[in-house]
Amino acid sequence: MIARLAGRIILLSGWRRALAAFLSGAFATLTQPPFDIFVAGFVSFPVLVWLIDGAIARTDAGPLRRLLPAAKVGWWFGFGYFVSGLWWIGTALLVDADQFAWALPLAVLGLPAFLALFYAFAAMIARLLWSDGLGRILALAFGFALAEWLRTFIFTGFPWNLIGYAAMPVPLLMQSVAVIGLVGMSALAVFVFAAPALLTGGHFARTGIGLAIFLALAHVGFGAWTLSRAPAIVDENGPLAVRIVQPSIAQAMKWDNAERRAIFDKLVGLTEEAPAEGKPRPDVIVWPETAIPYILESTPQALAHIGDALQEGQVLLAGAVREEKGADGGEPRYYNSIYTIDDRGRIVSTADKVHLVPFGEYLPFESFLRGLGLQEVVEMPGGFTAGTTRHALAVKDGRSFLPLICYEAIFPDELGYEGAGASAIINVTNDAWYGDTPGPYQHFRQAQVRAVEQGLPLIRAANNGLSAIVNTYGRITGSLALDAVGVVDSYLPSPRDPFWGRPPGWIQTVLILLTLLAASVGLILYSRRRFH
């Protein structure tokens, strides 16, 4: 039956092949949050393999014409994957629909069409290494691993919903990322998901199926072994008690000047709320991204009010817009920042967002695009300015946190920082732009994996959720649901040493890619000697 199905898929051509690739990519989205149906990958990727088999059937064409059919299949697969996985981005444009609704097709269709080029590239690279049986599965894993790595930095990068996350729906399956990194997880996921295509036979088919089963069992086994050695999920003797404030301010209200005092009072009220029975008195309180509705440098009364709300020894970490006056009366600069404020209402330290969202927080090619009448989605004169360096944020008792503002948490290779060693990751964000869509769940999963990957606990304060404290094994020690109003009180989990120490992320990536490339090329050469 599988051979018959594969044969029918291989024989598809024209729009039928494109539609099958699109639907296969869309089905693969079910492997990502909030669905986490990872078995969908065992359908989508074998179909992709068979579609590429059909696309490369001709061998009499020139080099480019041999590559293009596979690239087209990859593009349609990617287009389906990204349209169905990122459609919710368009909801941000409907917050101010009168001004931004015109851009909805660009967000819902244009961005997926661009991102699909990476999967077209993946299929094209795989085609170069394609060989019968196991060789094509290795080639596809290499192509996707390379493409997903490029997605982390090309054109400022947008590594959202990397295939590797499909293999990490629960903490048990997150532990391998500490060893092989996110690119390695993407390669593992593609190889294992695509392996059922070998059930139709081919060179080394049994070897490939056996290897996929072994890798899947090793992935699960390593997770079980790691978690069996993990400490208690909640450390009730932790050195630092943390409170996360989740106000769930509607996005339409957030930038309304008439609502500023009400928003501020709500944040202060949640900060002053007594801990529930059995919960610790917080040492550190965290507010979400741009939570403070004032420019603190020019609003001393807001700082005084914060100081009054904090108990002795408490520290507030809060997201706010930071203003830097222009030289000689020039235009001021604005930064998306995190402030540390002590119990006397003094600013102790600040950290600015380094990796801004294109078109959301700043305009690429600003002079040209402003000339066309375009502007950022965030209503900030001139947009935000990027911070120059990422540094550890001084907090309390000699401890410091690694600040990641909003979508900075999705970049696995951007966690280098200056200053003393951080004892936690602090991620402040505002996902209210996206409402009750898959977006906030996908964003949270990526931040959750950073804790495992880096060996640092995660403190995540999101305006409308998902707010949580996550230990270094990916386990949640306290959380609030989407759109809930309240606080999370919990002790800060301890950090742990990463599996490989802290080498630059690119070293791990290059080793994975070279291993896959060597295996693919070696299998091609061996097959030619043995079967021809």
From Swiss-Prot:
Keywords: Acyltransferase, Cell inner membrane, Cell membrane, Membrane, Transferase, Transmembrane, Transmembrane helix
Pathway(s) this gene product operates in, as recorded in its UniProt entry: Protein modification; lipoprotein biosynthesis (N-acyl transfer)
Residues annotated as catalytic: 289, 353, 406
GO molecular function, one term: N-acyltransferase activity
GO biological process: lipoprotein biosynthetic process
Annotated EC: 2.3.1.269
Keyword check for S-adenosyl-L-methionine: no
Subcellular location: Cell inner membrane
Residue ranges of every copy of the CN hydrolase domain listed in the record: 245-494
CDD domains: ALP_N-acyl_transferase
Pfam families with a match to the protein in the record: CN_hydrolase, LNT_N
Domain of life from the UniProt record: Bacteria
Membrane topology annotation: Multi-pass membrane protein
GO cellular component: plasma membrane
Transmembrane regions: 37-57, 75-95, 106-126, 128-148, 179-199, 207-227, 505-525
Family stated for the protein in its record: Belongs to the CN hydrolase family. Apolipoprotein N-acyltransferase subfamily.
HAMAP family given in the database record: Lnt (MF_01148)
Function statement: Catalyzes the phospholipid dependent N-acylation of the N-terminal cysteine of apolipoprotein, the last step in lipoprotein maturation.
Protein name: Apolipoprotein N-acyltransferase
